[in-house]
Amino acid sequence: MDKQHNINRRDFLKIVGISTLGATASLYGCSPKKDSEKEGNTTVPVGKMTYRNFPPYEDKVSLLGYGCMRRPTLPAPDGTGNVIDQEEVNRLVDYAIEHGVNYFDTAPVYVQGWSETSTGIALKRHPREKFFVATKMSNFSNSDYDFGVKMYHNSLKKLQVDYIDYYLLHMLGAPGKKGLEGRFLDNGLLDFLLKEREAGRIRHLGWSFHGIKEEFDKALALHDKYHWDFIQIQLNYSDWKHASGNNINADYLYSEIAKKDIPVVVMEPLLGGRLSNIPEHIFTRLKERNPEGSVASWAFRFAGSPEKVLTVLSGMTYMEHLQDNIRTYSPLVPLTQEEKDFLEETAQLMLRYPTVPCNDCKYCMPCPYGIDIPGILVHYNKCVNEGYMPKSRQDENYAKARRAFLAGYDRSVPKLRQASHCIGCGQCNPHCPQSIDIPKELHRIDRYVEQLKQETL
């Protein structure tokens, strides 16, 4: 590794848990993740990737896009936290490009602000024409014009590029001053970005969305005035007709965008991993239908089948996930109507399980009081899906389930970062794209933990 890479890697110190505790919950929760089991088809095709192109644009974009919200990490040399494993990031990016992936999506706020730098280091080692890079204006906390312009220029610097292929107004959907008007229209930032697009430093300008229908309709209606080049939405077979919280069903979002002939970038095809870490009988149902394919491949085939989808983002922290997704899209086998109906039935089955709609995005972090919010919610959801949520001491597997939940909780989340330490300040709530009442959920989980400890269920 050269000097530049060593310097950056040493600088990638982050607060303990921001990058790894969510992964720890998956590794040391109630039981190993089912979908990581060896699949029947282990061949990873080369030169078979499905690409999408939407004239008049010339871009030939891989259907599999690389989401850079999460990164592999290593313990920091000084023991104070964790560092991005830049060598592993480079290896994953090299492998992705070798197998046809050419779209890389990042943002200034990802990985505690280090994702753009890490992504830039990995991509700089490849010819510029080999990849498209997407990043965002994540001006959630400060909508000042100068702050936004500085964020944009910093993105160019960190990514080590002269232009950005796909630039997004990040996470539209909140009403009022935190919405489109307050963050981009009233302060002149959208005018600035339009000029950057005209100058060629932004090749395609669009926005990503989480939020209420009125804000979506408002932003989409501005297409005639501003000409959005693409729009990024949450789309998966669960949210297609059963979106939770304030989110809108993906079939509505997609159909409205398609009416205007705008390409769609898909995020959350796995709902933050919840569509691969599923209850045992649903896992069996999917595997019986297609023994050779992974459970995740069902979700990716669903997300990639709509014809207006440009690319489907996946945060592939591990090589096995990258390889599995490459297999799914090399080439894509679109879902039949019968298979779509099968997945709708599967989505309805999953609604019976009271999981918290957390996608492990970590926008709620860091908590000012050190609570590992995503680690807690990921562990809780995992135990719900795997049947380790006893409702009564009379349950047949009460002792086993109680032990699995409590032991897994302590392994996944350090005691000082558990839900019992939440004071309910609510600073996390405005940042959650799923509109979860986070303190309420943490207090509910803490009460349940205490009932398990005291055996008072």
Q: Model-flagged regions — what are they?
A:
Residues D2-F131, F192:
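N-terminal binding-site loop/beta-alpha segment at the start of enzyme catalytic domains
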Residues S115-T119, K213-D217, L322:
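Short, well-ordered alpha-helical microsegments
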Residues P75, N142-V265, L270, I278, ...:
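Glycine/proline-rich, positively charged
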Residues L27, F54, H227, Y252-L457:
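Structured C-terminal cap/extension of enzyme domains
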Residues F54, Y66, F104, T119, ...:
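Conserved, mostly hydrophobic/aromatic
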